[in-house]
């Protein structure tokens, strides 16, 4: 499936009949300067058991972990296809983004093998961004992996500054609340000297008020964290509404004015 912006979605089926997705994309040029690399976003699980309220994958339930070899296949198959259609750009550096279907930390053994294998064998690999809902006991293991490889960028979902609301959006918060999550992420930064990026998805009428913004600013220590602002994407069974870009810009400007590194 090819989008108007040039990104491509791939759907893979394994020998057990499970489906997963991968996406090839490039970021838009900044100040008319093209980015030097492209991105391949891969899945780490067939389905997911986290059941985040905004995510279609959670509706599938959990089926199976991808093996590290299957994750490597995702990268290799996408790259082979890109070489056919865009050989010049396919030879540049790329990032292997683990932000597709599944919760990576719940498949840590295979994530470990995948990251280690790819990092040691592919000189074109630039970074490995990994996004998690925040499985607190496993964050120290990711810190150890980052210290070995040094190319991991850790993203953690935080979609409300309030525990009660965050538990409604992301049920995992009932097990690991905001305080314990941020504490583990602060320790990750201290152990790796790499800041954690908090992904805050803006949902109209849910977490985009001025009060949310003010309390989010109070919650975030810029010494340990950066922020990535996302806009909710309408799904086939949309429960929420995508906000206008102006809302994200307001959040972005206020965060920056308070010394917090932020991007949209």
Predicted regions located by residue number:
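Flexible, acidic/Gly-rich N-terminal and inter-domain linker regions that tether
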Residues: 1-38
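Canonical Radical SAM [4Fe-4S] cluster-binding loop centered on the CxxxCxxC motif
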Residues: 26-73, 77
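Conserved AdoMet/S-adenosylmethionine-binding subsite of the radical SAM
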Residues: 79-254, 258
């Amino acid at each position: 499936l090819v989008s108007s912006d040039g990104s491509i979605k791939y759907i893979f089926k394994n020998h057990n009949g499970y489906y997963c997705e991968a996406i090839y994309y490039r970021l838009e040029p900044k100040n008319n300067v093209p980015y030097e690399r492209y991105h391949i976003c891969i899945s780490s699980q067939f389905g997911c058991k986290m059941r985040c309220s905004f995510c279609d994958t959670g509706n599938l339930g959990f089926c199976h972990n991808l093996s590290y070899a299957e994750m490597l296949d995702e990268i290799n198959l996408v790259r082979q296809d890109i070489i056919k259609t865009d050989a010049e750009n396919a030879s540049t550096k790329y990032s292997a983004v683990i932000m597709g279907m599944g919760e990576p930390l719940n498949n840590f053994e295979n994530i470990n093998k995948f990251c280690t294998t790819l990092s040691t064998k592919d000189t074109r690999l630039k970074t490995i961004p990994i996004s998690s809902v925040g499985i607190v006991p496993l964050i120290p293991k990711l810190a150890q992996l980052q210290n070995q490889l040094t190319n991991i960028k850790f993203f953690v979902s935080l979609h409300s500054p309030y525990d009660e609301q965050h538990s409604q959006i992301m049920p995992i918060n009932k097990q690991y609340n905001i305080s314990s999550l941020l504490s583990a992420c602060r320790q990750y930064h201290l152990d790796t000297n790499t800041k954690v990026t908090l992904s805050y998805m803006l949902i109209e009428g849910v977490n985009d008020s001025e009060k949310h913004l003010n309390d989010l600013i109070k919650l975030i220590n810029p010494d340990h964290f950066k922020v990535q602002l996302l806009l909710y994407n309408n799904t086939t069974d949309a429960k929420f509404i995508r906000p206008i870009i102006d809302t994200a810009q307001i959040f972005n400007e206020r965060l920056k004015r308070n010394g917090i590194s932020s991007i949209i």
